[in-house]
Amino acid sequence: MKYFSSITKTKLYFLLLITNCVYAQKYDVVIKNGRVVDGSGNPWFAADVAIKSGKIVGIGFFQTSEAVKVIDAKNQIICPGFIDVHTHVEDGLQKLPTADNFIYDGVTSIITGNCGGSELNLAKFFDELKQIQTSVNVGSLIGHNTVRRYVMRNVFRDPTPKEQVQMEALVEQAMKDGAVGLATGLIYIPGTYSKTPEVVGLARVAAMYNGIYASHIRDEASKVKEAIEEAINIGREAHIPVEISHFKISSKPLWGQSNTTIGLVEKARLEGIDVNIDQYPYTASSTNMGTMLPSWALSDGDSIIHIRLTNAETRKKIRTEMLKNLKADNRQNFDYAFVARYKEDSTLNGKNVSEINKLLGRKTNAETEADLIMDMVDKGGAQMIFHKMSEEDVSRILQYPYTMIASDAGVIQFNKNVPHPRGYGSNARVLGRYVREKQVLRLEDAVRRMTSLPAQRFRIDNRGLIRVGYAADVVIFDENKITDKATFEQPHAYSEGIDFVLVNGVAVLENGKHTGKKSGEIIYGKGKLE
């Protein structure tokens, strides 16, 4: 009996040992000793966060022995991963799937397809991303410009009834493939040629599949109020939630009137129209040089555009409109417009139009600068940076409770071209400059704008909060150190102060360095057919 008892005790000992080992490592990751800002806007609280199989499974206090990996977040903030709702990654993400500029800025999920430009075949796009794998989660809108160009090319006219039906069918297919909504870019070709009823028809289709309507509105300068009203009216007519992209005032005579433009949004919300806005925290925008020309000049394809831009009479007409717009903006020249990327001559990158004009030995006046712009557009155009906004408006818009933070950026190849710094530092800039330094926002409010508010707006389930059952998209940062380092003069610099970024429970950024891990997933819209 003693022998049997000894054997039994030995077995029980090893059974308990094995059980304790299993119990000891029941979590993949435990983040300890931090202050949790959960994304709701509520005050921070002290807690550990436990992660298992890509999900948050516990919020409380845990032993280090319970986890395979322990992250010490002492004196740091633990918050949900940032959701960037306005990006353009259609090309770049497949070339650089690690999306470094986003990860270093704390972004774990992105929405692409904005400003009316997306992949047409989203099922194929999503499949390709799943094959290459990415470091960020990705969702997409379906672009109005993409659909219109496919059906009508770049013609300057209304669609026929048949063409309208064709466009609506393409939007419907995209929604079934998982688009989160419809996006317009109403200053771009060919979307700028559309009238409101055309867009309403497409938005109604997106609404049928629980999508939203995101719009780069028709004018962000002298007619910005009318453009905001149009976006709101599309929401009203189509019964669809509205997202006004990169909300701004880029007309000098209207600087300081953001209280009025925000008021239009608030009035619509009081009416029962679901309107939100997003913003990048900079006083400069970035888009293509073609937007500096009247839209009619860019219709009907490259060959026709070339004829217009080399015809003396047509050039005169274009120049007259450009100078009229310049005067309306209370400007004497085009020195606000900087070249970010010009394939024809990269030595011009980083210089403004006035500087380039002088460099080429031309007369220093607005007329010759307008001619230079036409010449550059004729040679393929350039990506530009426009310094046209006021700090007062940026700060006021940022404080509006329904404003989200968005970069309006793509995947950036480090040290190539002279891009807008927003692609590197939008979130860190808000947390460093506007929360810590200027105290425009509470920390908890800023985090909400980057996390749960975007998730709610784009109907992204189980992300955007530190909550049990939610995806373990987590950012850990030092609120006293987080800062953007990218500037307009030196844009290629990653944000600092973010130590860890977890995407679906996997450390993609660890101790401030990208690990190369690609744990991102596809974010499908509610209309996705299984």
Regions found by a protein language model. Give the residues of each.
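Active-site neighborhoods of metal-dependent hydrolases
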Residues: 141-142, 150, 154-161, 165-189, ...
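Divalent-metal coordination cores built from histidine and acidic residues
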Residues: 73-78, 82-89, 94-184, 203-210, ...
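Histidine-rich, glycine-flanked metal-binding segment
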Residues: 26-31, 36-81, 484
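Bacterial Sec-dependent N-terminal signal peptides
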Residues: 1-26
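Acidic, glycine-enriched loop/beta-strand segments at the rims
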Residues: 36-48, 354, 381-394, 441-447, ...
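C-terminal cap of metal-dependent C-N hydrolases
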Residues: 34, 395-402, 408, 475-521
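Divalent metal-coordination and catalytic microenvironments
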Residues: 34, 49, 54, 75, ...
